Amino acid sequence: MKQGLIGVLALALGATLLSSAVWAKTPWQEIAHPVAGTPQSIGSFSNGCIIGAQPLPLQSLDYQVMRVDQRRYFGHPDLLAFIHRLSTEVKRTTSGNVLVGDMGMPVGGRFSSGHASHQSGLDVDIWLQLPRQRWSEQQLLKPQPIDLVNASGLNVNPRVWRPEVTTLIKTAALDSDVTRIFVNPAIKKQLCAEAGHDRDWLRKVRPWFAHRAHMHVRLRCPADSLECQEQSEPPIGDGCGAELTSWFQPKQPSSEAPEKTTPPPLPPSCQALLDRHFAAR
């Protein structure tokens, strides 16, 4: 019981960090509107920005957008098109509504907390639940995640795991614009067990810390975004063997203090974007 409570508290804390507005703002969070221009994703997913970002339409029959008060629903047009494709197909196959979490800020850039990536307009968090009934405005502003992983962290919780979660993740992975989908290792383990002979899509599904209630979907660099830095391809194979097993091995405690890291220099085009914005104020 104690372990279960710890798991619930950990999930709640994670959700609080992701949605907190009390942290000090970064310069990027002070820019309220996209920069006009031909859409261009610049830099890397964890050190970049975007010109010509577009807001995801907040009204759709197939998806709902959460925490709109935080204005994290901007992205490259390719990302908006992916969300439309995903939600349309998932609605057709499951009758459920896709819940869209954080995308990016109006010009991308670094968050003060919650995300290291989501900076170049090509990342989106999709919650791993598909409600048949539309959520109210209050539910969308204060969404309640469902922790799909049990207290041990070794397996999904069978009481809350649903087959349509596999459908949701697989549908996203089969999209040609998607390069990676980050989920909790226990969720990846469950997907490996359910996949059967059709396993190629599992290559894109990558185990990562947390991600107990949502998947983080990342798209490839758009062909015409010449300053976008592509991530290397995932390793060959379904990722269900030794690589996945390593996530469940006991971690050896380190005797060394963690090194303090400083953010890398911005790509020149992103620094210029910031400079122009604040010079005009």
From Swiss-Prot:
Binding-site residues for Zn(2+), renumbered to this chain: H115, H118, D125, H216
GO BP, one annotated term: proteolysis
First-tier enzyme category under EC: hydrolase
Keyword field contains Hydrolase: yes
Cystine bridges: C49-C270, C192-C240, C221-C228
Cofactor(s), by name: Zn(2+)
Location(s) in or outside the cell: Periplasm
CC cofactor note: Binds 1 zinc ion per subunit in the active site.
Protein known as: Penicillin-insensitive murein endopeptidase
